[in-house]
Protein backbone atom coordinates (compact mmCIF):
# COMPACT_ATOMS: atom_id res chain seq x y z
CA UNK A 1 0.00 0.00 0.00
CA UNK A 2 1.23 3.47 -0.78
CA UNK A 3 1.79 6.40 1.54
CA UNK A 4 -1.45 8.11 0.45
CA UNK A 5 -3.48 5.07 1.46
CA UNK A 6 -1.91 5.04 4.92
CA UNK A 7 -2.43 8.77 5.36
CA UNK A 8 -6.10 8.75 4.37
CA UNK A 9 -6.90 5.57 6.26
CA UNK A 10 -5.19 6.73 9.41
CA UNK A 11 -6.94 10.08 9.28
CA UNK A 12 -10.29 8.31 8.95
CA UNK A 13 -10.30 7.56 12.65
CA UNK A 14 -10.23 11.31 13.25
CA UNK A 15 -12.76 12.00 10.51
CA UNK A 16 -10.22 13.54 8.13
CA UNK A 17 -9.22 12.88 4.52
CA UNK A 18 -9.30 14.34 1.00
CA UNK A 19 -11.06 13.83 -2.33
CA UNK A 20 -10.51 15.16 -5.80
CA UNK A 21 -13.23 17.73 -5.01
CA UNK A 22 -10.88 19.32 -2.49
CA UNK A 23 -7.69 18.62 -4.39
CA UNK A 24 -6.34 22.07 -3.50
CA UNK A 25 -5.64 20.75 -0.01
CA UNK A 26 -2.05 19.64 0.35
CA UNK A 27 -0.64 16.77 2.35
CA UNK A 28 0.45 19.35 4.90
CA UNK A 29 -3.18 20.49 5.18
CA UNK A 30 -4.29 16.96 6.00
CA UNK A 31 -1.51 16.60 8.54
CA UNK A 32 -2.53 19.86 10.19
CA UNK A 33 -6.17 18.77 10.30
CA UNK A 34 -5.13 15.53 11.97
CA UNK A 35 -2.95 17.47 14.40
CA UNK A 36 -5.89 19.72 15.28
CA UNK A 37 -8.00 16.67 16.00
CA UNK A 38 -5.28 15.01 18.05
CA UNK A 39 -5.13 18.16 20.17
CA UNK A 40 -8.70 17.52 21.27
CA UNK A 41 -7.48 14.65 23.44
CA UNK A 42 -4.86 16.92 25.00
CA UNK A 43 -7.64 19.34 25.91
CA UNK A 44 -9.53 16.48 27.57
CA UNK A 45 -6.75 15.63 30.01
CA UNK A 46 -7.76 15.32 33.64
CA UNK A 47 -5.22 15.40 36.45
CA UNK A 48 -1.69 16.77 36.42
CA UNK A 49 -1.59 17.09 32.64
CA UNK A 50 -0.23 19.11 31.05
CA UNK A 51 -3.56 20.11 29.50
CA UNK A 52 -2.70 22.67 26.82
CA UNK A 53 -6.11 24.36 26.84
CA UNK A 54 -5.63 25.25 30.52
CA UNK A 55 -2.21 26.80 29.90
CA UNK A 56 -2.28 30.46 30.83
CA UNK A 57 -5.27 30.11 33.14
CA UNK A 58 -5.13 30.37 36.92
CA UNK A 59 -5.83 26.64 37.30
CA UNK A 60 -3.65 24.61 34.89
CA UNK A 61 -4.31 21.27 36.64
CA UNK A 62 -7.59 19.60 37.63
CA UNK A 63 -8.92 16.79 39.81
CA UNK A 64 -5.51 15.67 41.01
CA UNK A 65 -7.04 14.20 44.19
CA UNK A 66 -9.21 11.51 42.55
CA UNK A 67 -8.84 8.35 44.63
CA UNK A 68 -10.62 5.05 45.20
CA UNK A 69 -10.12 3.09 48.42
CA UNK A 70 -7.04 5.17 49.11
CA UNK A 71 -5.49 4.57 45.67
CA UNK A 72 -4.67 7.37 43.26
CA UNK A 73 -6.90 7.18 40.17
CA UNK A 74 -6.29 10.68 38.80
CA UNK A 75 -5.66 11.32 35.13
CA UNK A 76 -7.22 10.05 31.94
CA UNK A 77 -9.61 11.89 29.65
CA UNK A 78 -12.81 13.74 30.47
CA UNK A 79 -16.03 13.06 28.63
CA UNK A 80 -16.46 15.31 25.58
CA UNK A 81 -16.46 18.94 26.66
CA UNK A 82 -17.32 18.07 30.27
CA UNK A 83 -15.35 17.15 33.39
CA UNK A 84 -16.71 13.72 34.32
CA UNK A 85 -14.90 10.58 33.21
CA UNK A 86 -17.25 8.00 31.74
CA UNK A 87 -15.35 4.82 31.04
CA UNK A 88 -18.24 3.45 28.97
CA UNK A 89 -17.29 5.75 26.09
CA UNK A 90 -13.67 6.29 27.10
CA UNK A 91 -12.81 2.61 26.78
CA UNK A 92 -14.20 2.62 23.26
CA UNK A 93 -12.39 5.82 22.28
CA UNK A 94 -9.04 4.77 23.71
CA UNK A 95 -9.08 1.35 22.05
CA UNK A 96 -10.06 2.74 18.64
CA UNK A 97 -7.35 5.39 18.83
CA UNK A 98 -4.72 2.85 19.89
CA UNK A 99 -5.83 0.48 17.14
CA UNK A 100 -5.54 3.26 14.56
CA UNK A 101 -2.04 4.04 15.80
CA UNK A 102 -1.06 0.39 15.60
CA UNK A 103 -2.54 -0.46 12.21
CA UNK A 104 -1.80 2.75 10.34
CA UNK A 105 1.69 3.13 11.68
CA UNK A 106 3.06 5.11 8.75
CA UNK A 107 0.67 8.01 9.17
CA UNK A 108 0.91 7.79 12.95
CA UNK A 109 4.68 8.04 13.09
CA UNK A 110 5.52 10.02 9.95
CA UNK A 111 2.83 12.63 9.55
CA UNK A 112 1.81 13.55 13.07
CA UNK A 113 4.37 16.08 14.18
CA UNK A 114 5.50 16.61 17.74
CA UNK A 115 4.73 19.96 19.31
CA UNK A 116 3.84 21.34 22.69
CA UNK A 117 1.52 24.31 21.98
CA UNK A 118 2.57 27.61 23.48
CA UNK A 119 -0.76 29.39 23.03
CA UNK A 120 -4.25 28.30 23.96
CA UNK A 121 -6.75 28.98 21.18
CA UNK A 122 -6.99 26.14 18.63
CA UNK A 123 -8.16 28.62 15.99
CA UNK A 124 -5.03 30.74 16.30
CA UNK A 125 -2.30 28.28 17.25
CA UNK A 126 -0.22 27.14 14.26
CA UNK A 127 1.02 23.58 14.27
CA UNK A 128 4.69 24.56 14.41
CA UNK A 129 4.33 27.03 17.29
CA UNK A 130 5.29 24.51 19.93
CA UNK A 131 8.51 22.84 20.94
CA UNK A 132 9.30 19.25 19.88
CA UNK A 133 9.75 16.76 22.73
CA UNK A 134 10.76 13.76 20.57
CA UNK A 135 7.54 11.86 21.37
CA UNK A 136 4.87 11.51 18.70
CA UNK A 137 1.78 13.50 19.60
CA UNK A 138 -0.58 10.56 19.19
CA UNK A 139 1.65 8.19 21.15
CA UNK A 140 1.91 10.77 23.91
CA UNK A 141 -1.88 11.06 24.16
CA UNK A 142 -2.26 7.29 24.17
CA UNK A 143 0.29 6.98 26.95
CA UNK A 144 -1.57 9.53 29.05
CA UNK A 145 -4.76 7.52 28.77
CA UNK A 146 -3.06 4.15 29.15
CA UNK A 147 -1.39 5.32 32.35
CA UNK A 148 -4.82 6.10 33.73
CA UNK A 149 -6.14 2.64 32.82
CA UNK A 150 -3.16 1.20 34.70
CA UNK A 151 -4.43 3.01 37.80
CA UNK A 152 -8.06 2.08 37.13
CA UNK A 153 -7.27 -1.64 36.87
CA UNK A 154 -6.73 -2.09 40.60
CA UNK A 155 -7.31 -5.84 40.78
CA UNK A 156 -9.74 -8.51 39.63
CA UNK A 157 -12.46 -7.13 41.92
CA UNK A 158 -11.95 -3.39 41.55
CA UNK A 159 -11.93 -1.39 38.33
CA UNK A 160 -12.76 2.33 38.02
CA UNK A 161 -15.40 3.03 35.36
CA UNK A 162 -16.73 6.50 36.31
CA UNK A 163 -15.23 9.54 38.04
CA UNK A 164 -17.59 12.34 39.02
CA UNK A 165 -21.31 13.09 38.88
CA UNK A 166 -22.87 14.35 35.66
CA UNK A 167 -25.58 16.42 37.31
CA UNK A 168 -23.14 18.22 39.60
CA UNK A 169 -20.75 18.67 36.69
CA UNK A 170 -23.37 20.61 34.74
CA UNK A 171 -23.99 23.22 37.44
CA UNK A 172 -21.15 25.55 36.39
CA UNK A 173 -19.75 26.43 32.97
CA UNK A 174 -16.10 26.83 33.97
CA UNK A 175 -12.77 25.26 33.11
CA UNK A 176 -11.82 21.90 34.60
CA UNK A 177 -9.20 23.55 36.78
CA UNK A 178 -11.69 26.02 38.21
CA UNK A 179 -14.36 23.38 38.74
CA UNK A 180 -12.09 21.05 40.68
CA UNK A 181 -11.81 23.75 43.36
CA UNK A 182 -15.59 23.96 43.81
CA UNK A 183 -17.50 21.79 46.26
CA UNK A 184 -18.75 18.31 45.40
CA UNK A 185 -22.25 19.63 44.75
CA UNK A 186 -20.88 21.81 41.97
CA UNK A 187 -18.71 19.15 40.37
CA UNK A 188 -15.55 19.78 42.38
CA UNK A 189 -13.43 17.64 44.69
CA UNK A 190 -13.77 15.26 46.32
CA UNK A 191 -15.65 13.37 43.61
CA UNK A 192 -17.62 10.16 43.74
CA UNK A 193 -15.77 7.26 42.10
CA UNK A 194 -17.38 4.09 40.74
CA UNK A 195 -14.92 1.25 41.13
CA UNK A 196 -16.87 -2.00 41.42
CA UNK A 197 -19.68 -1.83 38.85
CA UNK A 198 -20.93 -4.99 37.18
CA UNK A 199 -19.27 -3.90 33.94
CA UNK A 200 -17.37 -6.22 31.64
CA UNK A 201 -17.59 -3.87 28.65
CA UNK A 202 -15.52 -0.93 29.91
CA UNK A 203 -12.84 -3.04 31.56
CA UNK A 204 -12.69 -5.25 28.46
CA UNK A 205 -12.05 -2.37 26.08
CA UNK A 206 -9.52 -0.88 28.50
CA UNK A 207 -7.76 -4.25 28.48
CA UNK A 208 -7.83 -4.27 24.68
CA UNK A 209 -6.33 -0.78 24.55
CA UNK A 210 -3.61 -1.69 27.04
CA UNK A 211 -2.79 -4.87 25.13
CA UNK A 212 -2.29 -2.82 21.96
CA UNK A 213 -0.09 -0.37 23.85
CA UNK A 214 1.99 -3.26 25.19
CA UNK A 215 2.62 -4.18 21.56
CA UNK A 216 3.34 -0.78 20.01
CA UNK A 217 4.93 1.39 22.69
CA UNK A 218 8.68 1.51 21.95
CA UNK A 219 9.56 1.75 25.65
CA UNK A 220 10.11 -1.72 27.13
CA UNK A 221 9.19 -0.62 30.65
CA UNK A 222 5.87 0.69 29.33
CA UNK A 223 5.29 -2.54 27.44
CA UNK A 224 5.58 -4.57 30.64
CA UNK A 225 3.47 -2.12 32.65
CA UNK A 226 0.67 -2.04 30.08
CA UNK A 227 0.59 -5.80 29.58
CA UNK A 228 0.31 -6.42 33.31
CA UNK A 229 -2.56 -3.92 33.58
CA UNK A 230 -4.24 -5.40 30.48
CA UNK A 231 -4.33 -8.80 32.15
CA UNK A 232 -5.73 -7.27 35.35
CA UNK A 233 -8.46 -5.40 33.46
CA UNK A 234 -9.30 -8.56 31.52
CA UNK A 235 -9.54 -10.52 34.76
CA UNK A 236 -12.15 -8.01 35.94
CA UNK A 237 -13.99 -8.15 32.60
CA UNK A 238 -14.21 -11.96 32.70
CA UNK A 239 -15.96 -11.95 36.06
CA UNK A 240 -18.40 -9.09 35.40
CA UNK A 241 -21.27 -8.59 32.98
CA UNK A 242 -23.02 -5.63 31.40
CA UNK A 243 -22.20 -1.92 31.37
CA UNK A 244 -22.07 0.71 34.12
CA UNK A 245 -25.36 2.60 34.27
CA UNK A 246 -24.93 6.40 34.49
CA UNK A 247 -28.52 7.59 34.56
CA UNK A 248 -29.25 10.27 31.97
CA UNK A 249 -25.70 10.30 30.60
CA UNK A 250 -24.67 6.77 29.61
CA UNK A 251 -27.50 4.40 30.38
CA UNK A 252 -26.72 0.70 30.20
CA UNK A 253 -29.93 0.09 28.23
CA UNK A 254 -28.40 1.92 25.27
CA UNK A 255 -26.09 -1.07 24.74
CA UNK A 256 -29.10 -3.37 24.32
CA UNK A 257 -27.10 -6.32 25.61
CA UNK A 258 -24.03 -5.64 23.42
CA UNK A 259 -21.45 -5.73 26.20
CA UNK A 260 -19.40 -8.84 25.40
CA UNK A 261 -17.53 -7.07 22.62
CA UNK A 262 -15.39 -5.59 25.41
CA UNK A 263 -13.89 -8.84 26.73
CA UNK A 264 -13.97 -10.34 23.22
CA UNK A 265 -11.72 -7.61 21.81
CA UNK A 266 -9.52 -7.87 24.90
CA UNK A 267 -9.04 -11.57 24.17
CA UNK A 268 -8.17 -10.86 20.53
CA UNK A 269 -5.64 -8.16 21.41
CA UNK A 270 -4.06 -10.15 24.23
CA UNK A 271 -3.65 -13.02 21.78
CA UNK A 272 -2.12 -10.70 19.16
CA UNK A 273 0.30 -9.29 21.73
CA UNK A 274 1.30 -12.43 23.63
CA UNK A 275 0.67 -15.19 21.09
CA UNK A 276 -0.89 -17.28 23.86
CA UNK A 277 -3.55 -19.57 22.38
CA UNK A 278 -5.66 -19.51 25.55
CA UNK A 279 -6.80 -15.99 24.65
CA UNK A 280 -7.69 -17.03 21.11
CA UNK A 281 -9.65 -20.01 22.41
CA UNK A 282 -11.54 -17.77 24.83
CA UNK A 283 -12.40 -15.37 21.99
CA UNK A 284 -13.69 -18.21 19.81
CA UNK A 285 -15.84 -19.47 22.67
CA UNK A 286 -17.23 -15.97 23.24
CA UNK A 287 -17.83 -15.19 19.56
CA UNK A 288 -21.28 -16.73 19.43
CA UNK A 289 -22.42 -14.51 22.32
CA UNK A 290 -21.91 -11.30 20.33
CA UNK A 291 -25.16 -9.59 19.33
CA UNK A 292 -24.66 -9.47 15.57
CA UNK A 293 -28.37 -9.25 14.77
CA UNK A 294 -28.63 -6.12 16.93
CA UNK A 295 -25.28 -4.66 15.98
CA UNK A 296 -25.98 -4.78 12.26
CA UNK A 297 -28.94 -2.45 12.70
CA UNK A 298 -27.05 0.71 13.66
CA UNK A 299 -23.72 2.43 13.09
CA UNK A 300 -20.44 1.96 14.94
CA UNK A 301 -20.34 3.91 18.20
CA UNK A 302 -19.53 3.50 21.88
CA UNK A 303 -22.71 1.49 22.51
CA UNK A 304 -22.35 -0.65 19.38
CA UNK A 305 -18.88 -2.10 18.87
CA UNK A 306 -20.22 -5.14 16.99
CA UNK A 307 -19.03 -3.85 13.57
CA UNK A 308 -15.46 -3.57 14.86
CA UNK A 309 -15.68 -7.03 16.39
CA UNK A 310 -16.66 -8.39 12.98
CA UNK A 311 -13.65 -6.75 11.30
CA UNK A 312 -11.19 -7.82 13.99
CA UNK A 313 -12.52 -11.38 14.20
CA UNK A 314 -12.03 -11.87 10.48
CA UNK A 315 -8.52 -10.43 10.66
CA UNK A 316 -7.39 -12.56 13.60
CA UNK A 317 -9.20 -15.79 12.82
CA UNK A 318 -8.68 -15.46 9.05
CA UNK A 319 -12.16 -16.89 8.75
CA UNK A 320 -14.85 -16.41 11.35
CA UNK A 321 -15.35 -19.19 13.92
CA UNK A 322 -17.66 -22.03 12.96
CA UNK A 323 -18.29 -20.38 9.58
CA UNK A 324 -21.49 -18.91 10.97
CA UNK A 325 -21.12 -15.24 10.06
CA UNK A 326 -20.92 -13.40 6.78
CA UNK A 327 -17.63 -11.72 5.91
CA UNK A 328 -16.94 -8.45 7.74
CA UNK A 329 -17.40 -6.32 4.64
CA UNK A 330 -20.95 -7.63 4.36
CA UNK A 331 -21.65 -6.39 7.88
CA UNK A 332 -20.24 -2.96 7.01
CA UNK A 333 -22.18 -2.73 3.75
CA UNK A 334 -25.42 -3.48 5.59
CA UNK A 335 -24.75 -0.68 8.08
CA UNK A 336 -23.19 1.93 5.81
CA UNK A 337 -23.20 1.50 2.03
CA UNK A 338 -26.81 0.36 1.78
CA UNK A 339 -27.99 3.40 3.80
CA UNK A 340 -25.71 5.97 2.14
CA UNK A 341 -26.95 8.99 0.20
CA UNK A 342 -24.60 10.12 -2.54
CA UNK A 343 -22.10 7.74 -0.90
CA UNK A 344 -22.18 9.67 2.39
CA UNK A 345 -22.82 7.39 5.38
CA UNK A 346 -25.61 8.49 7.69
CA UNK A 347 -28.38 7.48 10.04
CA UNK A 348 -31.44 5.79 8.52
CA UNK A 349 -33.37 8.94 9.50
CA UNK A 350 -31.29 10.95 7.08
CA UNK A 351 -29.51 14.27 7.35
CA UNK A 352 -30.42 17.31 9.38
CA UNK A 353 -29.95 18.71 12.85
CA UNK A 354 -29.44 15.94 15.35
CA UNK A 355 -29.51 13.28 12.65
CA UNK A 356 -25.95 13.53 11.38
CA UNK A 357 -23.49 12.64 14.11
CA UNK A 358 -19.91 12.93 12.90
CA UNK A 359 -19.28 9.40 14.12
CA UNK A 360 -21.28 7.95 11.20
CA UNK A 361 -19.05 8.95 8.25
CA UNK A 362 -15.84 8.88 10.29
CA UNK A 363 -16.64 5.53 11.89
CA UNK A 364 -17.67 3.96 8.61
CA UNK A 365 -14.57 5.26 6.86
CA UNK A 366 -12.35 3.91 9.63
CA UNK A 367 -13.92 0.45 9.57
CA UNK A 368 -13.69 0.14 5.78
CA UNK A 369 -10.08 1.36 5.92
CA UNK A 370 -9.26 -1.17 8.62
CA UNK A 371 -10.88 -4.00 6.67
CA UNK A 372 -9.09 -2.98 3.47
CA UNK A 373 -5.79 -2.86 5.33
CA UNK A 374 -6.22 -6.38 6.69
CA UNK A 375 -7.23 -7.62 3.23
CA UNK A 376 -4.46 -5.71 1.44
CA UNK A 377 -6.81 -3.94 -0.96
CA UNK A 378 -7.82 -0.41 -1.99
CA UNK A 379 -11.35 -1.48 -2.86
CA UNK A 380 -13.14 1.06 -0.68
CA UNK A 381 -10.80 4.04 -1.01
CA UNK A 382 -13.33 6.14 -2.92
CA UNK A 383 -15.93 5.77 -0.17
CA UNK A 384 -13.35 6.41 2.52
CA UNK A 385 -12.20 9.62 0.85
CA UNK A 386 -15.72 10.77 0.07
CA UNK A 387 -16.96 10.48 3.64
CA UNK A 388 -14.00 11.86 5.47
CA UNK A 389 -13.55 14.80 3.12
CA UNK A 390 -17.20 15.65 3.73
CA UNK A 391 -16.19 16.39 7.31
CA UNK A 392 -13.43 18.73 6.12
CA UNK A 393 -15.87 20.94 4.25
CA UNK A 394 -16.49 19.10 0.99
CA UNK A 395 -20.26 19.42 1.33
CA UNK A 396 -23.05 21.69 0.14
CA UNK A 397 -22.72 24.12 3.03
CA UNK A 398 -18.90 24.10 3.06
CA UNK A 399 -19.14 23.16 6.73
CA UNK A 400 -16.02 21.86 8.44
CA UNK A 401 -16.49 19.63 11.48
CA UNK A 402 -12.96 20.23 12.77
CA UNK A 403 -12.45 23.19 15.11
CA UNK A 404 -9.99 25.57 13.52
CA UNK A 405 -9.89 23.90 10.09
CA UNK A 406 -10.98 26.36 7.40
CA UNK A 407 -8.81 25.48 4.43
CA UNK A 408 -10.32 25.79 0.96
CA UNK A 409 -13.00 28.14 2.25
CA UNK A 410 -14.50 25.67 4.72
CA UNK A 411 -16.53 27.12 7.59
CA UNK A 412 -14.99 25.87 10.84
CA UNK A 413 -17.07 25.47 14.03
CA UNK A 414 -17.25 28.76 15.92
CA UNK A 415 -18.89 27.66 19.18
CA UNK A 416 -17.54 24.23 20.15
CA UNK A 417 -19.12 22.44 23.09
CA UNK A 418 -15.97 22.55 25.20
CA UNK A 419 -15.69 24.56 28.39
CA UNK A 420 -11.92 24.87 28.25
CA UNK A 421 -12.16 26.59 24.87
CA UNK A 422 -13.67 29.69 26.49
CA UNK A 423 -11.18 29.76 29.41
CA UNK A 424 -13.90 30.94 31.79
CA UNK A 425 -12.89 30.62 35.44
CA UNK A 426 -15.72 32.65 36.97
CA UNK A 427 -18.66 31.13 38.80
CA UNK A 428 -21.39 30.73 36.23
CA UNK A 429 -24.65 29.01 36.96
CA UNK A 430 -27.56 27.78 34.90
CA UNK A 431 -30.40 30.32 34.74
CA UNK A 432 -33.76 29.15 36.00
CA UNK A 433 -35.26 30.86 32.97
CA UNK A 434 -33.26 28.63 30.66
CA UNK A 435 -35.89 27.33 28.26
CA UNK A 436 -35.81 24.03 26.43
CA UNK A 437 -34.99 25.81 23.18
CA UNK A 438 -32.12 27.72 24.76
CA UNK A 439 -30.81 24.50 26.28
CA UNK A 440 -30.60 23.12 22.76
CA UNK A 441 -28.71 26.21 21.70
CA UNK A 442 -26.41 25.81 24.70
CA UNK A 443 -25.68 22.26 23.57
CA UNK A 444 -24.64 23.70 20.22
CA UNK A 445 -22.34 26.18 21.93
CA UNK A 446 -24.57 29.24 22.36
CA UNK A 447 -24.42 29.74 26.10
CA UNK A 448 -27.42 32.05 26.49
CA UNK A 449 -28.79 30.04 29.41
CA UNK A 450 -25.72 30.60 31.58
CA UNK A 451 -25.09 33.79 33.53
CA UNK A 452 -22.56 35.10 36.01
CA UNK A 453 -23.17 33.78 39.52
UniProtKB/Swiss-Prot annotation:
Its EC number is 3.2.1.4. Optimum temperature is 37-39 degrees Celsius. The active site is at 82 (nucleophile), 417. Keywords: Carbohydrate metabolism, Cellulose degradation, Glycosidase, Hydrolase, Periplasm, Polysaccharide degradation, Signal. It is found in: Periplasm. One of its GO terms (biological process) is cellulose catabolic process. It holds the Pfam family Glyco_hydro_9. InterPro entries: 6-hairpin_glycosidase_sf, 6hp_glycosidase-like_sf, Glyco_hydro_9, Glyco_hydro_9_His_AS. It catalyses: Endohydrolysis of (1->4)-beta-D-glucosidic linkages in cellulose, lichenin and cereal beta-D-glucans. Its main location: periplasm. One of its GO terms (cellular component) is periplasmic space. GO terms for molecular function: cellulase activity. Belongs to the glycosyl hydrolase 9 (cellulase E) family. Monomer. High levels of endoglucanase activity detected on acid-swollen cellulose, ball-milled cellulose, and carboxymethyl cellulose; moderate levels detected on filter paper, phosphoric acid-swollen cellulose, lichenan, and xylan. This is Endoglucanase A.
